[in-house]
Regions:
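Domain-level signal for soluble alpha/beta catalytic cores
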Residues: 1-226
Length: 226
């Protein structure tokens, strides 16, 4: 008989990001209306993330997820992390670029929105073409990982996986006929390797890579891309 003790570890896959009293919604809307500047928006976001970490720490989890907060949409956050931003949305700073993609402005239409796997949540659809220049931009992932580490929490960065990201995307308007975003999987996985390297260098011992698209019916070619 094996008398060795088995340890059960507890964690959660993610955490609600809107705030206990919908603080994020009010802060973002105030920013759009010009009543809260960029620094004020980030202060509100930081307070929500702090409350989230308080709750996760109090739950006694063995590992807490980081990178699950978003000002608007986690798929858009992933597009920013790999620099897959449509040229029409690029602005003078990251915040302006982010919200141009999310909401559009006087000069550019926003990204399309569609249902997240037939749920009531809608995500922003990235636009990918043969000439999309992917680059690793790990700033958000590193910052939120660092916030948890500063509290001495066993933090686990969470990323939307490259296969799901491309399957959730659509071909850019100027892409040639027959092009599919998944055609860029090799280039994108190289950028993900850079993101992972940055997280490991910052102290991450493991990273949660979500591939929800694999829960749906897929073609053989799509499955092979994994």
């Amino acid at each position: 008989m094996n008398d060795s003790k088995k340890t059960v570890h507890a964690t959660v896959l993610g955490y609600p990001r809107i705030g206990a009293d919908r603080e994020l919604k009010r802060a973002v809307e105030a920013h759009w209306a010009g009543r809260r500047d960029e620094a004020g928006l980030e202060a509100a976001a930081a307070a929500i993330r702090s409350e989230m970490l308080d709750d996760l720490a109090a739950a006694g989890l063995d590992s807490v997820p980081t990178g699950v907060f978003s000002l608007y949409d986690h798929v858009l956050d992933t597009a920013v992390a790999v620099d897959a931003i449509a040229p029409r949305h690029r602005r003078e700073n990251e915040s302006a670029t982010y919200f141009a993609a999310a909401r559009g402005d006087a000069t550019a239409a926003p990204l399309e929105m569609t249902k997240w796997f037939d749920t009531n949540y809608h995500y922003l659809v990235p636009e990918i073409g043969p000439d999309t220049e992917f680059r690793a931009r790990p700033g958000k992932a590193l910052a939120e990982f660092g916030e948890a580490r500063a509290r001495r929490l066993n933090a686990r960065p969470v990323l939307l996986g490259p296969v799901s990201f491309l399957l959730l995307a659509k071909a850019a308007d100027d892409a040639p006929e027959g092009f599919a975003p998944l055609d860029r999987i090799e280039e994108l996985t190289a950028v993900y390797a850079e993101l992972l390297s940055a997280l490991v260098e910052a102290g991450a011992e493991w990273v949660q890579i979500d591939e929800p698209a694999l829960c749906a019916d897929r073609t053989e070619a799509e499955r092979e891309a994994v």
